[in-house]
From Swiss-Prot:
It holds the Pfam family LeuA_dimer. Its cofactor is Mn(2+). It comes from Prochlorococcus marinus (strain MIT 9312). Mn(2+) binds at D17, H208, H210, N244. Pathway: Amino-acid biosynthesis; L-leucine biosynthesis; L-leucine from 3-methyl-2-oxobutanoate: step 1/4. SUPFAM superfamilies: 2-isopropylmalate synthase LeuA, allosteric (dimerisation) domain (SSF110921), Aldolase (SSF51569). The lineage of its organism: Bacteria, Bacillati, Cyanobacteriota, Cyanophyceae, Synechococcales. This is 2-isopropylmalate synthase. Residues 408-546 are annotated as: Regulatory domain. It comes from the Bacteria. The gene is leuA. GO terms for biological process: L-leucine biosynthetic process. Homodimer. The keyword Transferase applies. Its EC number is 2.3.3.13.
Length: 546
């Protein structure tokens, strides 16, 4: 019986593979905010995390399963290595979701078997059916991945896939784990799997790929032509190393070139039926949310969601667009949720008006979060005459982004000029013992002085590796968004903040980054690809939900 869904399923792994980007560590509230937005976006599957990694990861997957998992919503999925410890933890984490999936995997390439797993092909042929079968006793929906499939021996790969399907796998994922393959090679690999695995019709073929050679999206589209029906991707293409295949690029390629791809689904070229279930008008908002919460700025020239994606500098191009946008634009900006509309909110606007506008924009805030957001709105309205949707997005994103706060900024005072040394006075609250302390520092500029003072107070050794600031909207009174990235022990942590005063924004962003660093070191998680299987057969936690 064919498992072909008749369209493309979008499997979002922003919260799992995307979070493995250096500096992109997210707290529980941030993960929930992104998961809710992914559900509004219309993804079919949310890979919420790797539950066995740490108690924090388990709790996040469990909370998303409980709060975002709905009968009419996305499947909530957790990752598990091919071992009982991982699979059991994964099942317990996703169990509250009405639609749940266990995604288990093992490497199939000889280089991974020899150097990472220290196992033989014979070992893998024994492990795969045993672990898939075990997972099947817990949930019906099982995805199995052949890690590093693109560098695996094809005949061995076919054998592993056949065993996984026979044991109960309903989705077979073919990863290009190191971004090694080219479109023609990847398309042929999917085609050959269809031809050489006798029971392949009993499972959906999925693909997962990294962008090390800049070919991930092209590889996926070639895979679609050859029978892949699930695409594993991330918002803004974030992920380890050069990132993953970009969700927005894949979705819009299938949207804009639907007449081309329809034939691969046995449809009439002019069929109006969408190839995905994505609500494209939610793309821009989702991109900005992920960018703000992870601290990973989207490059200006990035397709679909970059600041310049719909900008025209050339006079010839500008003239053509003014006469007819189709002359130089293949996508209407409104299709991905871009709008120049401004809202008439100001300092006289009340809580109800702000709440109503946020609800129209798709934000569902708790009473406490709404009160905090409204307080920030009123503070901004006293300094800025006209409040735009982008201003509200910045306010809400920062509100959600606040990590577990060991440190809270109480005072920022800076003096600088061309005839004086930049000097910063900072007061910081340490919530661990509820004490305030003040420090004064000089620096090469006001931001450097602020960071030096904060380092004196926090006493958390780190290296500042990136500082960036951009304007949220136009005008002299615009909010300035600051992103700061710091490094400690080869790990990167990001902080983000927005304020009409960029020095205050920089101070808040630096404190956020410090709080992330402290929170991450408490978390003590493991990586699914770099820890051996033996570790996962140990007892996970006596009470993993705590």
């Amino acid at each position: 019986m064919s498992k072909d869904p008749g369209r493309i399923l979008i499997f979002d792994t922003t919260l799992r593979d995307g979070e493995q980007s250096p500096g992109a560590s997210l707290n529980l509230e941030e993960k929930l905010a992104i998961a809710h937005q992914l559900a509004r976006l219309g993804v079919d599957v949310i890979e919420a995390g790797f539950p066995f990694a740490s108690p924090g990861d388990f709790k996040a997957v469990n909370k998303i399963s409980n709060d975002v998992g709905k009968e009419n919503g996305p499947i909530i999925c957790g990752l598990a290595r091919a071992s009982k410890g991982d699979i059991k933890a994964c099942y317990e984490a996703v169990s509250p979701a009405p639609k749940k999936r266990i995604h288990t995997f093992i490497a199939t390439s000889d280089i991974h078997l020899k150097h990472k797993l220290k196992k033989s092909r014979k070992d893998v042929l024994q492990i795969v059916p045993e672990m898939v079968n075990y997972a099947k006793t817990l949930v019906e929906d099982i995805e199995f991945s052949c890690e590093d499939a693109s560098r695996s021996d094809p005949d061995f790969l076919y054998e592993v896939i056949q065993l996984a399907i026979s044991a109960g796998a309903t989705t077979i994922n073919i990863p290009d784990t190191v971004g090694f393959t080219t479109p023609s090679e990847f398309g042929k690999l999917i085609s050959d799997i269809n031809k050489n695995v006798p029971n392949i019709d009993e499972a959906v073929i999925s693909v997962h790929g990294h962008n090390d050679l800049g070919l991930a999206v092209a590889n996926f589209l070639e895979a679609v032509k050859n029978g892949a029906r699930q695409l594993e991707c991330t918002i803004n293409g974030i992920g380890e190393r050069a990132g993953n295949a970009s969700l927005e690029e894949l979705v819009m390629a299938l949207h804009v070139r639907k007449s081309f791809f329809n034939s691969f689904f046995k449809r009439n070229p002019d069929s109006p039926t969408p190839l995905t279930a994505i609500r494209t008008e939610e793309i821009t908002k989702t991109s900005r949310l992920v960018s703000n919460l992870t601290g990973m700025t989207v490059q200006p020239n990035k397709a679909i969601v970059g600041a310049n994606a719909f900008a025209h500098e050339s006079g010839i191009h500008q003239d053509g667009v003014l006469k007819n946008r189709l002359t130089y634009e293949i996508i209407d900006a409104k299709t991905v949720g871009l709008s120049d509309n401004k809202i008439s909110l100001g300092k006289l606007s009340g809580r109800s008006a702000v709440r109503a506008r946020l609800e129209e924009m798709g934000y569902d805030l708790s009473r406490e979060d709404l009160n905090d957001a409204f307080a920030r709105f009123k503070d901004l309205a006293d300094r800025k005459r006209e409040i735009t949707d982008r201003d509200l997005e910045a306010i809400v994103s920062e509100q959600v982004q606040l990590p577990e706060a060991k440190f809270q900024l109480c005072l920022v005072q800076v003096s600088c000029g061309n005839a004086s040394k930049p000097t910063a006075t900072i007061t910081l609250l340490n919530t661990a013992d509820n004490t305030e302390d003040t420090a004064v520092s000089v620096g090469t500029g006001p931001v450097d002085a602020v960071c030096e003072a904060l380092n004196k107070l926090a006493k958390v050794p780190n290296e500042l590796i990136e500082f960036s600031v951009k304007s949220v909207t136009e005008g002299i009174d615009a909010l300035g968004e600051v992103t700061i990235r710091i490094r400690r022990d080869n790990k990167i942590y990001s902080g983000h903040s927005a304020d009409t005063d960029v020095v205050v924004a920089a101070a808040n962003a630096y404190v956020n980054a410090l709080n992330r660093l402290v929170f991450s070191e408490k978390k003590n998680s493991i990586h699914p690809q770099f820890d051996n299987l033996e570790n996962s057969n140990k007892t996970f936690l006596s009470n993993p939900a705590n």
